[in-house]
Amino acid sequence: MKKILLVRPPRFLWPFINESDNFLLPLGLPCIAGQIRSKLPDIEIKIIDCPPLKIGWESLGKIIREENPDMVGAGEEALYCHEAVRLFNLAKEINPAVITVAGGHFFSWMVDHSLNDFPIDFIVRFEGEETIVELIKAINEKKNLVEVKGIAYKNNGQIIRTPPRPLIKDLDTLALPAFDLMPMGKYSPFGYLWPQSVTLEHSRGCIDRCNFCSLWTFWGQHLKTDIEKGELDVTPRYRTKSVERMLEEIDIVYKKYNRKYIIWADPTFNVDDKWTNDFCDGLLKRNYKDLHWWAFLRADYLLRDEKAGILEKMVLAGLTHPLIGVERGCTEDLRKVQKSVYTRDLVKEVFLILKNKYPQVFRQGTFITCLPFDTRESMLDLVKYAVEIDIDYPAFHPVAPVPGTFLYQEALKNNALEEKDFRKYDWATPIMRSDNGFSMEEFAKLNMELNKRYILYRPHWIFRGLFSPYKHKRGLYWWFLQNTLKMMFLGVMDVVLGKKKFEGITGFMRLKKPGWYDS
């Protein structure tokens, strides 16, 4: 094996953000490529990131023919797993001898389904840097594949799962991501949400056990992983790179690639207060101009950080868009989804601090909706909660129990999945069957009503943001207004022009096919 092609295939667009903001840098690809290049320098490796380059399926086929790789790899989440499958089919049509390797959140869990139904030769399960290097070595040296930990494959029709690979203890030992193989200038060049963005991570894993989240289970300690047989046993694990290593990565993307907006992929950015403090000190010493960042933060830790003076440093160092997982408004609901319990008073205090002391930041909270036990009253209470804590943007997301979450296992057991097409697991479409008689369309209308009540019934909210004295916050409010109007207009025009039939509220939220998709 001499040449490897890693691909993010073409895909549909989120309708409620512009195309430039749709495609953030897929960090897994340069991480895998960097490790292969570091350990196996004789291997030629290329990355084809189709969406930001507007490479459609016809063009991708030409590229694969021209490159003639020995191995094609892709990793996907449930929402886009069908695009990876199409890639593997295309690669095998062009060259039946090509080795296809799948990874990422979906394929790591859905082993039997993937190997039995799709043209996949190997699955690299979960954390992939060490596994892919060892797999390539084993193939090239014709070693016994069963000795490679963390893979799944077929041998004479039988599916083989090798033992889980131990987690990488020291993330600093990993090679730097191969940003030079990515089209760095193409990520959000005209973005409203994340202009000149780059995706980075300083940690892997989480300390919480939310039953709707696949991030902590993916990066956790895997004890039982055969979810297709109902087996799931994972222990949360949290690891972080050193401050020095993280500052080195930021130096590269800022100085070499002029990336000014960091999207932190960490499930929880502010777990370790000492790390955060030292990191912000290092970043402030660099005095980078116009550097901003977006991060998932825990509310209780944010309160801790404020009392220690760390939150102030975070804002000075570039924190512009804190996103807090509020999720639900009552203790009973939080316990049902196995999330750490925040009291309403604690969450309100945190958002009040952000509003009064750091008015330049855009305060966002996420709320999960359309759970089986939801009633009209329980969902409308989330709007009251959002008003109570006075945030800039409440994201009301219908829950999508993807493979690898404990909620998915529970839903399978209770036959609670109303929608089984993973192409609709987009956190905008209701998925789970209601215990209280709601149809999926009724759930969708109710979820839309939450947005209407927060936005349309409170016009001062939108006007306050549109004329904010802070450029970044003002831009986000204009983005919100423009894209809401655009989404509604395009949805109506599709129906008027006969491009599709009216699908109700859910139809406005579906992913849209870009013009370059087939080209």
Model-derived regions, located:
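Radical SAM enzyme core and accessory elements
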Residues: 3-6, 18, 41-44, 61, ...
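N-terminal [4Fe-4S]-dependent radical SAM core
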Residues: 10-13, 148, 154-202, 226
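Short catalytic helix/loop segments, enriched in acidic residues and glycine
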Residues: 22-36
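Glycine-rich beta-alpha loop elements in corrinoid/cobalamin-binding modules
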Residues: 35-39, 44-170, 397-404
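Conserved strand-turn element in the central/C-terminal portion of the radical SAM core barrel
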Residues: 52, 296-302, 325-338, 351-378, ...
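Short beta-strand/loop segments at the ligand-binding rim of alpha/beta enzyme cores
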Residues: 93-102, 290-292, 360-364
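Catalytic cores of alpha/beta
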Residues: 113-116, 372-388
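Radical SAM [4Fe-4S] cluster-binding motif and immediate context
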Residues: 177-362, 384
